[in-house]
Amino acid sequence: PWGGVEQLAWTKDGKKLIYTCRKKIGIDYAESTNTDLYAYNTENGETVNLTEGMMGYDKNPVISPNGRYMAWESMEREGYEADKIRLYVMDLTTGEKNDFSEGFDQNAEGLKWGDDNTIWFISDWHATDEIYSLDIPTGRITKHTDGVHNYTSVIPTGKMLLATKVSMSKPAEIYK
């Protein structure tokens, strides 16, 4: 919906472009919050809706390092812009989708793959934005930071994380 590069992802083999799109026109476009993720095949020109039947915002796809999985942010209901942002993962070989944030009563935003089994993200906790991770094999979500500040992004880089942190008393700074 906003048109940034975070709404695009290439599959590891470079043959498909995953993109976010709201394929509506006129008033329907203006009133709808239903976006989907589409896979455009660069070899044959075919486009497939990967999130068909999911009625809220589906956006910001990220592909796992091994190319097998795609994670994305998803809202459940159309027309409800304040809906919880869920963390979904799809197996790109089978099409199976899993909501890993079911039972996690917070948003999951700014998804980044650490390795093939870990997704790092930002979530709000008691009016602060903190760093969390999802361990895919167990489904366990772990909170890694706590304080009177906001983390605005997190990037896994091998054995360490880089993150930007802001507070009322400090401008944005990069931490590791």
Model segments located where?
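Conserved glycine-bearing catalytic or ligand-binding loops at nucleotide- and phosphate-handling centers
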Residues: 154, 172-175
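A flexible loop/linker signature enriched in serine peptidases of the S9 family
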Residues: 1-5, 20-36, 49-62, 71-88, ...
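Short loop/turn segments that connect beta-strands within beta-propeller blades
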Residues: 41-45, 91-95, 135-139
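Secreted/periplasmic carbohydrate-active enzymes, especially glycoside hydrolases
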Residues: 12-15, 143-146, 174
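Blade-terminus and WD-like Trp-Asp/Gly-His loop motifs, strongest in beta-propeller folds
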Residues: 8-16, 61-69, 111-118, 154-160, ...
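Hydrophobic, helix-prone linear segments
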Residues: 14, 39-41
